Regions:
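Conserved alpha-helix/loop element of class I SAM-dependent methyltransferases that forms part
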Residues: 1-17
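Conserved class I S-adenosyl-L-methionine
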Residues: 16-25
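Adenosine-cofactor binding site in Rossmann-like domains, unifying the SAM/SAH pocket
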Residues: 40-57
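A conserved beta-strand element that flanks and buttresses the S-adenosyl-L-methionine
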Residues: 66
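Short catalytic micro-motifs in class I SAM-dependent methyltransferases
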Residues: 69-73
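A short glycine-rich, Lys/Arg-flanked "PGG" loop and its adjoining helix->strand segment in the class I
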Residues: 79-90
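Conserved beta-strand signature within the Rossmann-like core of class I S-adenosyl-L-methionine
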Residues: 92-99
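Short alpha-helix
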Residues: 108-123, 128
Length: 155
C-alpha cells in the first residue's frame, strides 16, 4: 500500500469508512485499506472504465476518493478532478499522487501550479500540496521519483 496514503488515512479518519480508488490497477491500495477495515471500490481500464471521461460510481458518495499515479496518464486531466468531486460526499477527503516536473523518468509531469490550476472552478478545496522524493526499487527501475501530493476536501 502507498505509505503516504496509509499515513493520510490514519491521520484523517479515526474510523474506517468507504473509499473509491480511481485507477486501482492490481488493487494494492484497496487491499491495504480493506485490511484497515475500509469498504473499497476501484476502477480503471482493466475494469472497463476510461478515466478520461467523467465517472460516477453507483455506490457514491464516498468518504475518501484517491488516485495514485493516474492523472499524468490521462489526456483529459481535469476530468479526473471532476470525477473525484462527483463521487465524494460533502466534506469528504481526496488524495492524489503524480509525478512532479523534476522527475526525469515520467513522460508527463506537473508543477505545483499546473496541478493546482486543475482545481479552479470545482467543488474541491486543496488543503495540502507537497513535493518529495521516493526511491523506486521495483525490478528494472532503481531510481528516484519526484512526487507531487495533493490532498483536500469537497466543499
Amino acid at each position: 500500500m502507498n505509505p503516504e496514503l496509509k499515513e493520510f488515512v490514519l491521520r484523517e479518519f479515526p474510523v474506517a469508512r468507504k473509499a473509491l480508488d480511481l485507477g486501482c490497477g492490481p488493487e494494492v491500495d484497496m487491499r491495504g485499506l480493506q485490511e484497515l477495515g475500509w469498504v473499497c471500490d476501484g476502477v480503471d481500464l482493466l475494469t472497463g472504465v476510461d478515466l478520461n471521461y467523467l465517472y460516477q460510481s453507483e455506490n457514491a458518495p464516498y468518504d475518501l476518493v484517491y488516485s495514485n499515479y493516474v492523472i499524468q496518464k490521462l489526456v483529459r486531466s481535469k476530468v479526473l478532478i471532476f470525477s473525484i468531486a462527483k463521487n465524494l460526499k460533502s466534506g469528504g477527503k481526496f488524495f492524489i499522487h503524480t509525478f512532479e516536473m523534476a522527475d526525469e523518468v515520467a513522460k508527463k509531469r506537473f508543477t505545483e501550479e499546473s496541478l493546482r490550476s486543475l482545481f479552479v472552478d470545482t467543488a474541491l478545496e486543496i488543503e495540502s500540496c507537497r513535493q518529495f522524493k521516493i526511491w523506486d526499487d521495483e525490478p528494472g527501475h532503481m531510481h528516484y521519483h519526484h512526487i507531487l501530493e495533493v490532498t483536500g476536501k469537497k466543499k
